[in-house]
Amino acid sequence: MARRLILGYQSYLSPLKMGPTCRFEPTCSNYALIAISRHGLIKGSVLALGRLARCGPWHPGGWDPVPPRRPLCSWGGRRR
């Protein structure tokens, strides 16, 4: 459902703007698609909302990739 909403935005609303307006690469909508597919709906949506909060004239923009997925077990094994 979230993916369809983002794709709908990209197909129907985004072209109505005069030229590219996102100051980031990947664009905020592509970032949201990647974040949701990589991290799941909840964490991906939180990451996408954080990106949207940074997307404004006060931020220089630039390359801002979706962070990699971290393993559930960061210490690599069973505790002894």
UniProtKB/Swiss-Prot annotation:
Could be involved in insertion of integral membrane proteins into the membrane. This is Putative membrane protein insertion efficiency factor. Pfam families: YidD. NCBIfam families: membrane protein insertion efficiency factor YidD. It comes from the Bacteria. It is a peripheral membrane protein. GO terms for cellular component: plasma membrane. It comes from Corynebacterium jeikeium (strain K411). InterPro entries: Membr_insert_effic_factor_YidD. It is found in: Cell membrane. Its main location: membrane. Keywords: Cell membrane, Membrane. Belongs to the UPF0161 family. The keyword Cell membrane applies.
